[in-house]
A protein has these predicted regions:
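Active-site-adjacent segment of FAD-dependent monooxygenases/related oxidoreductases
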Residues: 1-46, 63, 137, 146
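Short, mixed charged/polar active-site loops
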Residues: 12, 79-81, 142
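Well-ordered beta-strand positions in beta-sheet-rich domains
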Residues: 14, 81-83, 116
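Short hydrophobic core segments
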Residues: 33, 59, 82-92
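Conserved FAD-binding catalytic core of PHBH/FMO-like flavoproteins
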Residues: 43, 86, 90-198, 202-207
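A conserved beta-strand/loop element that lines the FAD pocket in flavoprotein oxidoreductases
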Residues: 45-60, 186
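A conserved short coil-to-beta-strand element within the FAD-binding core of flavoproteins
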Residues: 55-70, 193-195
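A structured beta-alpha segment of the ubiquitous adenosine-cofactor-binding alpha/beta core
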Residues: 73-80, 85
Length: 212
């Protein structure tokens, strides 16, 4: 389920994915942190017989010809190289592989940024009828409240004129959290991050032996 809520009035609408269970085998919304997804993928790859999995490797350059390609990576032990027939670059919006292939990333980046604060505070014990996914409307500022195992995540829009030092300051984080729910006690903050949102697409998805 997920809800649209008014900060003052409570739940305005609730959507139950269970109502479409006869239409799909997956009547739910999945929220999975990147580090957990990486662990799941690592375990799955091992079950598929993949033995060489490397962490803390940053691709720095690549060379390719008609026979294959070589990727060079910076590692804690220095530069290493890996050779093969094909390369798939699945390294996100700031893809090094895409940049090394000079593939344009056309579109734009939204000016608005989004601050995410994670806390073990149990909002469900304080806010009545709270879902695990909640979009809050308010005349002053909207926000998003999301439950993941062990934590609640609160997402706020951030003004363009706010600098990162101010955004991540302990006082500003606490001020935002108390605005969502005034507890009178400091929140235990587990994690904070600032996101940019891109509306972009790669100009093309293949460069000889490299795929995005």
């Amino acid at each position: 389920k997920f809800q649209y809520r008014d900060r003052s009035e409570g739940c305005l609408a609730e959507f139950d994915f269970g109502l479409i269970s006869d239409e799909t085998n997956h009547p739910y919304r999945v929220q999975c942190e990147q580090f957990k997804l990486n662990m799941y993928l690592e375990n799955w790859l091992k079950t598929q017989g993949v033995e060489d999995i490397h962490f803390n490797h940053t691709v720095s350059k690549l060379k390719q010809d008609d026979q294959g390609l070589t990727v060079y990576a910076e590692t804690p032990e220095g530069e290493k190289s890996f050779s093969g027939k094909w390369l798939i670059g699945a390294d996100g919006a700031n893809s090094v592989v895409r940049k090394l292939c000079s593939i344009d990333f056309e579109g734009f980046t939204w000016e608005e940024r989004f601050l995410v604060v994670s806390t073990p505070y149990e909002y469900e014990k304080t806010i009545n009828d709270l879902s695990f996914v909640n979009y809050f409307a308010d005349p002053e500022q909207w926000f998003f409240l999301l439950k993941v195992p062990g934590f609640w995540r609160v997402m706020f829009p951030v003004q363009n004129n706010e600098n990162e030092v101010s955004i991540f300051s302990k006082d500003q984080i606490e001020k935002r959290m108390q605005w969502v729910l005034a507890t009178g006690e400091p929140f235990d903050i587990s994690h904070t991050t600032l996101y940019k949102v891109h509306q972009r697409v790669a100009n093309h998805y293949r460069h000889n032996r490299v795929f995005l």
